[in-house]
Amino acid sequence: MSTTPATPKVGFVSLGCPKALVDSERILTQLRMEGYEVVPTYEDADVVVVNTCGFIDSAKAESLEVIGEAIKENGKVIVTGCMGVEEGSIRDVHPSVLSVTGPQQYEQVVNAVHEVVPPRQDHNPLIDLVPPQGVKLTPRHYAYLKISEGCNHSCSFCIIPSMRGKLVSRPVGEVLSEAERLVKAGVKEILVISQDTSAYGVDVKYKTDFWNGRPVKTRMLELCEALSSLGAWVRLHYVYPYPNVDDVIPLMAAGKILPYLDIPFQHASPKVLKSMKRPAFEDRTLARIKNWREQCPELVIRSTFIVGFPGETEEDFQYLLDWLTEAQLDRVGCFQYSPVEGAPANDLGLAEVPDDVKQERWDRFMAHQQAISAARLQLRIGKEIDVLIDEVEEQGSVGRSFFDAPEIDGSVFIDGDHGFKPGDKVRCRVVDADEYDMWAEPI
């Protein structure tokens, strides 16, 4: 009497940024198409894949810790992702890992899984229940859309180009077809991600591709125009403040894409920006922000900054605080500088900022920006907003407005049971706010 072969099972841990999450989704989609079952525990898996982060040393430490945990609990571990470019460092700590690959090495990861636990020979991918949009690790109502790999910048604090390579833009027709599948599957919000969204298409000289039989240039403006036709929220992340960003502001003002820009300014002091090898035109940037807001008063700007970069003086830091007062950014994150192995900043010969000074500056930065953010959110009280529901709890619902990207920004809280479910879009009036969150009532 024949028996049905057991379904091969894979455990998966995804660390790091949304771009790494998209890599994980691609690998999982391929494995699911080949009949593998993805399981949530180490003990139920035949093999575990760990998609690592290698952006800063603390992320590497977390990656090594998770690899060790997977080895202890399962024993069969495949490593991929950004830290995978440092195979020696990984094998020095965990010599028993079965395979180590870098980011975007989808085929190699799948092949490594095959070697440990081959796919079932009787599996028919034509009848497998893999959705057309692939496997997604986000809630059903929003998804990340990665438009390119790599980066052409050489920021002194960053090693991403050495891990992910130079900019490689995905064909715009392919990107738009993926977005269309996502929306048809119920996605209400598309979060556009890359290492440098504003540079999309530079590497292919903005060549024309085709989507649904019509020509579309491989460029941020044309991509946004096409995405706006799908009927979902479109949110732009990792945008550099280049002149071509001016072109998408009218789309935001017209309500075609969300009036939201995620721009990693990193600092404001010209001296520090020069050391970071970042664009050092802070005065032009302020003028650009003012111009954007004149065209689109609803515009929300989120950014991230680094304090305590080598050579940063109290004067530089105060310059940054003054710049924040001028810029009036809405959503801001801040990190204390942490040396990254292999980063050019290590060789600049600049004075290190003591840890206690970094902490003190971080505290001052956060207090300064929280006051700005709180004041800006207070201006929303009494106004109407659309809220996309993320969670429904016993005491009420939690969602987000155009102000709020998932995971990194604030939330909108709606008290009471209104019968909402995740993915619903609800028109509300803001009744209260603090420095991060808003409270609203359905209209």
Swiss-Prot record:
Comment on bound cofactor: Binds 2 [4Fe-4S] clusters. One cluster is coordinated with 3 cysteines and an exchangeable S-adenosyl-L-methionine.
Gene Ontology annotations of biological process type: tRNA modification
Gene3D superfamilies: Methylthiotransferase, N-terminal domain, Nucleic acid-binding proteins, tm_1862 like domain
One MF annotation (Gene Ontology) recorded for this entry: 4 iron, 4 sulfur cluster binding
Enzyme Commission numbers on file: 2.8.4.4
Listed name of the protein: Ribosomal protein uS12 methylthiotransferase RimO
Catalytic activity as recorded in UniProt: L-aspartate(89)-[ribosomal protein uS12]-hydrogen + (sulfur carrier)-SH + AH2 + 2 S-adenosyl-L-methionine = 3-methylsulfanyl-L-aspartate(89)-[ribosomal protein uS12]-hydrogen + (sulfur carrier)-H + 5'-deoxyadenosine + L-methionine + A + S-adenosyl-L-homocysteine + 2 H(+)
Cellular component GO terms held in the UniProt record: cytosol
Function statement: Catalyzes the methylthiolation of an aspartic acid residue of ribosomal protein uS12.
Domain TRAM: 378-443
Keywords tagged on the record: 4Fe-4S, Cytoplasm, Iron, Iron-sulfur, Metal-binding, S-adenosyl-L-methionine, Transferase
The UniProt record lists the keyword Plastid: no
InterPro entries: Elp3/MiaA/NifB-like_rSAM, Methylthiotransferase, Methylthiotransferase_CS, Methylthiotransferase_N, Methylthiotransferase_N_sf, NA-bd_OB-fold, Ribosomal_uS12_MeSTrfase_RimO, rSAM
Annotated ranges, domain MTTase N-terminal: 8-118
Cofactor entry: [4Fe-4S] cluster
SUPFAM superfamilies the UniProt entry points to: Radical SAM enzymes
Cysteine pairs bridged by disulfides in the record: none
Encoding gene per record: rimO
Lineage, broadest ranks: Bacteria, Pseudomonadati, Pseudomonadota, Gammaproteobacteria, Pseudomonadales
HAMAP family: MTTase_RimO (MF_01865)
